[in-house]
């Protein structure tokens, strides 16, 4: 039996990329998934995000693996959408064993060209977002006296990159 058998994983930024890959990997190991993603275009940055169609496809793929998947469209910056998703997860699964804070953005700009709005969006999603989600999940983990929190980040935290002023 896998260490993840019958665990419930709440994953932000789950619609594509690392979030999607993690959701599928955990489902293959026996975990049920709460897939949380903004599932729409946001104001910054200028690249694509997960879509509601991608969330639906992820749900189908997780269920094809014999696991349950709750999809929740929401923004990690919005306490109400996070609270609603956590409440739905608890109502559906009764617990959250794993929190994978994966949602994040990157603003491609040099410091002299980055706008305040780009900076604020990046800080709010990459720093405040994990705080908001963790704050809403932790009470359930504390009640269960069990839980794992993983905060994902970028290799850019270890070394700089071209046009990455953060």
Where do the language-model regions lie?
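The beta1-alpha1 cofactor-binding region of Rossmann-like NAD(H)/NADP(H)-dependent oxidoreductases
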Residues: 52-56, 73-85, 116
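Active-site loop-to-helix junction immediately N-terminal to the catalytic Tyr of the SDR YXXXK motif
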Residues: 106, 114, 160-166
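Conserved glycine-rich Rossmann-like NAD(P)H-binding loop of the short-chain dehydrogenase/reductase
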Residues: 31-57
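Substrate-binding pocket helix/loop in short-chain dehydrogenase/reductase
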Residues: 110-111, 118-123
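Residue(s) in the substrate-gating loop at a strand-loop-helix junction
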Residues: 154
